C-alpha cells in the first residue's frame, strides 16, 4: 500500500518536472529561432492581423462597460466624501494600473488563446506539423514563433485600447450623465496619473501577460495528443492555466511595482 502511494506521488512529481522541462525547452527554442522572422515579416504581420481581430470587438465593448461601471460606482463612493471631482483620477488609475491589463489578458486568453490552442492542436492532429518536419521546415519557427510574437505585441495594444475606451465610458457616465465638472474630471486625471509609475507599469504588466498567455496557448496545442478529445481538453487547460497565471503574475508584479 505504501509502495503504491510512493510510486503514485513520485510518478506525478516526475511528470510535473518533465512538463516544466519540456515547456522551458520549447520556449527557449522558439526564442532562439525567432530572429528568422526578420526574413519573413509577412508571417508576423498576418498573425498580428488575425490575433488582433480575434479579440478587438470584445475588448472595445468590455472596456466601455467596465469604464461606465467604474465611473458609476466611483462617483457614488467619492460623493459620500465630497470628492466627486476626483472621479477622472479614480477611473484612470483603476484602468491603467489593474483593470486594463488584467481584464484584457483574461479576455485575450478566453478568445484568442483558445483559438491558438485549437489551431495548433488541429494542425498536429492533421499531421501538418509532421509534414513540415519531413520537408525540413521547423514548425516551431514557422508556426509557433510568428503567433507567439503576434500575441506578445497584441496584448499591450489591446490593453491600451481597453483603457482608453474605459476612460471614455467613465467620462460618459460621470460628466455627461451625472454632471461631474468636465474640467475637474480631466485635470484631476492629468495631475494624478504618473506616466512611469502608472501607465508604464501597466504596460509592463500587459507585456508579461501577453508572453505568458500566448506561450501557454501555443504549448498546450503543440503538446496535445492528435485526437479531438485531447485538443478539446487542451483548450480548456489554456483558459484555466492562463487565468491562474494572470492572477498570480498580477499579484507579484503589483507587489514589486507599487509596494514602495
For each feature predicted by the language model, list its residue ranges.
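Short, membrane-interfacial amphipathic segments enriched in basic
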Residues: 2-42, 221, 225
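Membrane-interface helix starts
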Residues: 36-61, 240
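Active-site cofactor/substrate anionic-group-binding motifs, chiefly glycine-
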Residues: 49-103, 107
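Membrane-interfacial helix-loop-helix connectors in multipass membrane proteins
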Residues: 73-96, 164-207, 211, 215-235, ...
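Hydrophobic alpha-helical transmembrane segments of multi-pass membrane transport proteins
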Residues: 87-130, 216
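Short cytoplasmic-facing helical segments at TM-TM junctions of multi-pass membrane proteins
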Residues: 120-145, 228-231
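Start (N-cap) of specific transmembrane helices in multi-pass transporter permeases
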Residues: 138-159, 234, 238
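Final/C-terminal transmembrane alpha-helix of multipass membrane proteins
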Residues: 231, 237-254
Amino acid at each position: 500500500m505504501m509502495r503504491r502511494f510512493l510510486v503514485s506521488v513520485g510518478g506525478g512529481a516526475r511528470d510535473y518536472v518533465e512538463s516544466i522541462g519540456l515547456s522551458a525547452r520549447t520556449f527557449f527554442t522558439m526564442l532562439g529561432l525567432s530572429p528568422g522572422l526578420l526574413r519573413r515579416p509577412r508571417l508576423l504581420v498576418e498573425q498580428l492581423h488575425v490575433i488582433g481581430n480575434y479579440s478587438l470587438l470584445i475588448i472595445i465593448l468590455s472596456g466601455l462597460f467596465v469604464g461606465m461601471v467604474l465611473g458609476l460606482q466611483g462617483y457614488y463612493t467619492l460623493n459620500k466624501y465630497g470628492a466627486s471631482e476626483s472621479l477622472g483620477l479614480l477611473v484612470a488609475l483603476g484602468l491603467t494600473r489593474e483593470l486594463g491589463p488584467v481584464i484584457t489578458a483574461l479576455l485575450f486568453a478566453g478568445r484568442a488563446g483558445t483559438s491558438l490552442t485549437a489551431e495548433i492542436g488541429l494542425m498536429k492532429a492533421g499531421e501538418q506539423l509532421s509534414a513540415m518536419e519531413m520537408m525540413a521546415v521547423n514548425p516551431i519557427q514557422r508556426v509557433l514563433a510568428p503567433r507567439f510574437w503576434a500575441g506578445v505585441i497584441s496584448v499591450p495594444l489591446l490593453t491600451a485600447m481597453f483603457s482608453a475606451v474605459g476612460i471614455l465610458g467613465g467620462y460618459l457616465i460621470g460628466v455627461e450623465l451625472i454632471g461631474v465638472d468636465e474640467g475637474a474630471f480631466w485635470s484631476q486625471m492629468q495631475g494624478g496619473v504618473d506616466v512611469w509609475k502608472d501607465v508604464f507599469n501597466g504596460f509592463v504588466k500587459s507585456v508579461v501577460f501577453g508572453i505568458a498567455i500566448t506561450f501557454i496557448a501555443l504549448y498546450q496545442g503543440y503538446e496535445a495528443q492528435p485526437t479531438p478529445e485531447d485538443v478539446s481538453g487542451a483548450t480548456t487547460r489554456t483558459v484555466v492555466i492562463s487565468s491562474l497565471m494572470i492572477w498570480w503574475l498580477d499579484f507579484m508584479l503589483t507587489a514589486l511595482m507599487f509596494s514602495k
